[in-house]
Amino acid sequence: TLGIVPPRESNVPWNTLSTDGPMGKTVEDVFLQMKVISGSDRLTPITFPESFKQNLQKPLDGNLKGLKIAWGGRLNNRPIDTEVFDITENAVKKFIDIGCDVSYDYPNLDDSDQVFQTYRAYKFAIDHINHVTDFPDLVKETVKWNTQKGLEMHLIDLARAEVLRKSIWRNMVDFFDRYDYFALPVTSVSPFSIDQEYPLEVNGIELDTYIDWMWPCYTISVTGMPAISIPCGFTSNNLPVGIQLVGPSNSDIGLLQLAYGYQEATEYWKTTPDMVN
């Protein structure tokens, strides 16, 4: 949830499009880090009171029986790699095994692309205008493009994005009146070659921008809701695939408990890459 982990010093301290958070091999690792890095910070305008950390003292081994989970693998009807979709759709069935009720459903987040691209361009213009102007030869083309996009925006673009984001937020709030958590893929493609800067297409559908392949992630970022990504399987080439779990605001401990239950039921974290064996 925005503010639980105080953001680092930023040119846009009221930014609500992203938040810092931990990474770890297991949910326990992430849980421990959350206990350490969360809390109040007088130097940032978006922060939670120190007392909120008491919620992180609950055990990870929570009661998951009867939780209502919505699976939205086709969210926004955006393109997604067939193998990634099949793996994540099969993986969500594991929640049934641990006592959850799973339904196929998703909220209306159709305008998330416009909102995300607008706010991202706005922030790039603030963060990188000096880099692009003073050191153009040291800045890659995607950063130049995103910065220029921000410089060319008008006030009406931000106004539209703000109105659309309000509707997205309300759609999510209403959605969580019916479900406890929302599950969807982490990205639209499996890991790709280090020699490829970004995917140009997904399932034969050409992408418009360098960031489009990450639509499952940034769609959730626009909502401002807490999320956690966990491994859920491997491709035919033994590449990892992830599923993300999303909850309503302030459901962080519940998300960690759900992720922990899934982790214990699947034990994907114990799988080592072929390069290690």
Predicted regions and their residues:
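Short glycine/threonine-rich loop-to-helix capping motif typified by GTGT followed
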Residues: T82-V84, D110-K123, S193-P199
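Short connector loops at secondary-structure junctions
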Residues: C100-F116, T147-G150
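Hydrophobic alpha-helical segments in the ANL/AMP-binding
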Residues: Y210-T223
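Acyltransferase
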Residues: N55, I80-Y106, H128-D134, L158, ...
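Short glycine-rich, flexible loops that bind phosphorylated cofactors or substrates
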Residues: R78, S190-P191
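Structural helix-boundary/capping segments
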Residues: T1-A70, L75, E89-I98, M153, ...
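Short, surface-exposed loop/helix-turn segments at secondary-structure junctions
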Residues: T47-E50, R160, F192-W213
